[in-house]
Amino acid sequence: PAPDSSFLRDP
């Protein structure tokens, strides 16, 4: 599955 893209989102 695709990796968690939460790190791509701005805080």
UniProtKB/Swiss-Prot annotation:
Any GO CC annotation of this UniProt entry: extracellular region
Secretion signal span: none
Record carries keyword Transmembrane helix: no
Keyword Metal-binding among UniProt keywords: no
Keywords attached to this entry: Neuropeptide, Secreted
GO biological process terms on file: neuropeptide signaling pathway
Annotated disulfide bonds: none
UniProt function note: FMRFamides and FMRFamide-like peptides are neuropeptides.
Protein family according to the UniProt entry: Belongs to the FARP (FMRF amide related peptide) family.
Protein name: Extended FMRFamide-10
Organism: Karoophasma biedouwense (Gladiator)
